[in-house]
Amino acid sequence: MRAVIQRAKSGSVTVDSKIVSQISHGLVVLIGVGHEDTAEDVEKVANKIIKTKLWPSVDGAQQWKQSVLDVGGEVLCVSQFTLFAKVKKGQKPDFHNAAKGPQAKELYDQVLAKIQAALPEGRTVKDGVFGAMMDVALVNDGPVTIQYDTKNDK
């Protein structure tokens, strides 16, 4: 499973000219599910999203001291199979390593559930529309953008 974790001042997802999800301060996360991914990958990626320290200390003196939970941030996730694109041969991307729709949706939904379980009461994980063409907007804070692949986490 792959994730692009972006610290954001704001983010939104628009489908058919309608905003379906939006956040202010927090994370915008693109998540790709691979055909070899399992529940173990779900656990790993959800933990990275909620626990990675991407914000400075409260006094601003030290970088990388607080997670999205620590700063009271929101989380907006967007499914994105194109994170598994290969472009080694030719010009056309190859998506064979991405999970097919039903498997991808099941594991993606599990990631959302794990993140939701970690959020304090009253806060909900936001997401786009699985499989839809979406306009994803964000104001990247920093910019801070982290790539994570559960198969290459050693």
Swiss-Prot record:
GO molecular function: D-tyrosyl-tRNA(Tyr) deacylase activity; tRNA binding
Primary location: cytoplasm
Self-association state and partner proteins as the record states: Homodimer.
Catalytic activity, as annotated: glycyl-tRNA(Ala) + H2O = tRNA(Ala) + glycine + H(+); a D-aminoacyl-tRNA + H2O = a tRNA + a D-alpha-amino acid + H(+)
Domain remark text: A Gly-cisPro motif from one monomer fits into the active site of the other monomer to allow specific chiral rejection of L-amino acids.
Domain of life per record: Eukaryota
Any single biological process term in GO: tRNA metabolic process
Keyword Cytoplasm: yes
Keyword RNA-binding part of the UniProt annotation: yes
Naturally occurring in which organism (per UniProt): Yarrowia lipolytica (strain CLIB 122 / E 150)
Top EC class of this enzyme: hydrolase
InterPro entries for this protein: Daa-tRNA_deacyls_DTD, DTD-like_sf
The family this protein is said to belong to: Belongs to the DTD family.
Motif Gly-cisPro motif, important for rejection of L-amino acids mapped to chain: 142-143
Keywords annotated in UniProt: Cytoplasm, Hydrolase, RNA-binding, tRNA-binding
PANTHER family in alphabetical order: D-AMINOACYL-TRNA DEACYLASE 1, D-TYROSYL-TRNA TYR DEACYLASE
Protein name per UniProt: D-aminoacyl-tRNA deacylase
EC number per UniProt: 3.1.1.96
GO cellular component annotations of the record: cytoplasm
Function: An aminoacyl-tRNA editing enzyme that deacylates mischarged D-aminoacyl-tRNAs. Also deacylates mischarged glycyl-tRNA(Ala), protecting cells against glycine mischarging by AlaRS. Acts via tRNA-based rather than protein-based catalysis; rejects L-amino acids rather than detecting D-amino acids in the active site. By recycling D-aminoacyl-tRNA to D-amino acids and free tRNA molecules, this enzyme counteracts the toxicity associated with the formation of D-aminoacyl-tRNA entities in vivo and helps enforce protein L-homochirality.
UniProt cross-references to Pfam families, sorted A to Z: Tyr_Deacylase
Subcellular localization, as worded in the UniProt entry: Cytoplasm
